[in-house]
Every structure is written in structure tokens, then in C-alpha cells.
Amino acid sequence: MAKASEDTPLLRQYFSIKAQHPDALLLYRVGDFYECYSADAVTLSKVLGMVLTRRNNGEKGDTEMAGFPHHALDTYLPKLVRSGLKVAICDQLEDPKLAQNKLVKRGVTEILTPGIAFGETMLEGKEHNWLAGLTYDGPECGAAFLDASTGTFRVAQGSVEYINTLLYSFRPSELVVQRDVWRTAREKYPEFCITPLDEWAFVPDAAREKLCSQLGVSSLKGFAVDRYPLAVCSAGALVSYLEQTHHTGLRNICSISRIDEGSFVWMDRFTFRNLEIFQSNSGTEGTSLVDVLDRCSSPMGSRLLREWLSLPILDIRALNSRYDVVQFFCDNEEALDEMRSRIRSEE
């Protein structure tokens, strides 16, 4: 990048903000448009199929530019995030009319990633959008799984093999790891979007403090996760990641629970694939098991069904309890219709 003094004032501001978010595509608000420049413009053009144009940059000549009207943000943002991009939204922080010929003050107001997304346009309501975090310590590993949109927060700790199995059960949209293991993680999990985070976020004391603050407690004993330090480190790191992406004060994230290794049937990625539980081996034309089973009346029900298929329980009493509920509704069609109606009315 050339010296900032060679840029026009607007692009000088753009590159200054971009330098603070080098790993994100920066959507920079200019009047009624969101614009990208230089390498980000090329990326935006390729992902969205937009025409790549150029903006004058004073002594440096022209630089690549691409953009779209601000009112189209809800249309294009999901496409960018689903393509695996981290997107920083840079808005005008003051009324341009009051700037009085000065450069309008701008700043990043929100960062969205594959694992941190909100709203109907961004999410598939029938599926959890998991953000996962991993902390390694020799042969052992701690994991955390967070759906920021619903507040569902799960942790686990055990062998690396066990955690690997969990990853393919949860199928997270994004995986956060310590920066020093990022390259190794990319090689090990090529199918996941992997984000590096500074090591301090995984330090036990800092992570525990972040997690307690988010949950509004002084101790984690009430959640029965305090004896699993690597899991707590992963969970705390995810809270730090939320803060770094300008997502603070999420009151729906108020509880956390541990996944008990001995309570479920564990299936590896090959089992999920061979049984076609979530994806058909015939591609988009085929039908998976969840496609056949999912007749749920609400997105919440669909998410729960997928969770049950991901983590089949071993407890016979719990299984029989589920069967009893199914039998009740099979024998009482009027009650079934009433329940369906009530659930749908709440959506």
C-alpha cells in the first residue's frame, strides 16, 4: 500500500479503517451507497457478479471500485457472508450536511461472519448457525458451540478424537482457534471456515471472566462447567470474539450447558455422510433423512429435530418418554391439531 499522504482524503480514511480490519471485506458508506476499493472491490465484484469500476485517487491515479445502493444491503450481505467472508460495515457517524466541507466521520458499526449472523435474511431458520471455538492442550481439547441468534451455548471437553466427532455433529459455520494453531487447523479441517483469534482470549482467567460477565454470574459452578477449563477457555474466547465484532449486550446468551460424552451415540463424518442424515449423496436432487422427517410446525422444532439427529441419546427412559409423547399425539388427533395451531400462531 502506498503512503497515506498520496491518497485522496476519502480513500485515506478508507485505507485507515481498512487497516484496522485487514481480514474483513469493508463496506464503506458513501452517501447512498456502500462501496469497496482496491482488493476488496475485486472480491465484491467476483462474489456478487458486479461490474468493477474505478475511482480517482489523486496522484496515485485510479483505484478499483465496486458498490451497491445502501437499501440493497439486506440483499447482498447474506450472499457475502454465506460465501465465507467476514464483512465489516462502515457507516457515516454524522450527518453529511453538518460536516461543512469536512470529511464525514465514519466508523465500523458491525462485523458479520459466517458464524455471527442475525435476522431472517441472513439465516436458515430451520438450522442452528453454530459458531465454534477450540482450545488444545496436548491430547485433550475443549470446545464451545454458540448459536448467537438463539442464545444456545454448549461446551465439551475430552480427547481430540471426541471433539472432532462433535465438530461433524454440529457442523459449525465458523471455527475460532488460537492464532498459533490457525494454519494447522486449516489443514486439518479444510471444510470449515476457520478464524484466528489472539492467544490472550483463550487464557483461562481472562476467558472465565468474559464468560461470567456474559452470563451475569460470579461463578460457573451453577452451570456444572467449572471443572472443564479447556471448554471454559473456548467459551470465553467466543464471547471475546463477539465483542470484537461489535456484538455486545446479547441478553439471549444467558445460560450454558455441557455435552456429556457418555449420553449420546457418536457418529463420525463418514457415518453422517453414508447414512445421508443431513445431505443426500445424490446432491441437490436427492433427499436426506432430515428432509423426510422434518414436518415441524416451527423453525425451533426443526432445529431441535436436527439436534436430536446429530446427537442421538442413549438413555432408554428419555427415549421412551419421547415415544410416549409421540404415541399420545398419534392417539389424539384433535390435540395434535390444536398444538400445531398454537405453535404456528407464535411464529
Which residues does each predicted region cover?
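Charged catalytic and DNA/RNA-contacting regions of genome-maintenance
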Residues: 2-332, 337, 341-345
